[in-house]
A protein has these predicted regions:
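ATP-binding glycine-rich phosphate-binding loop
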Residues: 14-35
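Short linear sequence motifs
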Residues: 1, 24-25, 49, 56
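A short linear-motif detector with a strong N-terminal bias
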Residues: 10-13, 22-24, 62-64, 104
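ATP-binding pocket architecture of kinase catalytic cores
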Residues: 32-136
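Juxta-kinase regulatory segment immediately upstream of eukaryotic protein kinase catalytic domains
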Residues: 1-20
């Protein structure tokens, strides 16, 4: 984790005081929440494939340029195996909809709004995200 802590300090200017592992979702990457005394949490990612990491970082930059709501990659290690990205919190969409699923699909108005916003964003990601995308 030293490489993530060094990357954090170089990027933020602050010492990392906590580096806590967080669960990954079906990925071979390892994820960590890094914070300093002032807060400033970032997610540190350690991958095993430079190509996969490069693709993720490229897509993040492309989607941000396209004004799409995706995590920003802040820093990438020299070897391309580690990077820092925005910390979007602990709650996934799947988690946020759990109560509605448990109630047999009877979602609250808040849960329905989350679903509506998510579904509405998908075509935008496909259309705007596909413009000028290097598919090679």
């Amino acid at each position: 984790m030293d490489i993530l802590k060094d990357l954090y300090k170089t990027h933020t200017g602050f010492e990392c005081v906590a580096c806590e592992p967080i669960p990954g979702a079906g990925s071979n990457r390892k994820y960590y929440r890094l914070t300093c005394e002032k807060g400033n949490p970032l997610i540190g990612v350690v991958g095993t494939s430079r190509d996969e990491n490069h693709a993720f970082c490229y897509l993040s930059k492309h989607f941000i340029t396209s004004k799409l709501p995706v995590p920003h990659v802040h820093a990438i290690s020299d070897d391309g195996l580690c990077y820092l990205q925005d910390d979007l919190g602990d709650t996934t969409l799947f988690d946020a909809l759990k109560a509605g699923r448990d109630a047999g699909g009877r979602y609250t108005s808040h849960e329905k709004e989350l679903l509506r916003r998510t579904i509405a964003a998908l075509p935008d990601i496909q259309i705007r995200g596909g413009r000028n995308l290097d598919f090679s």
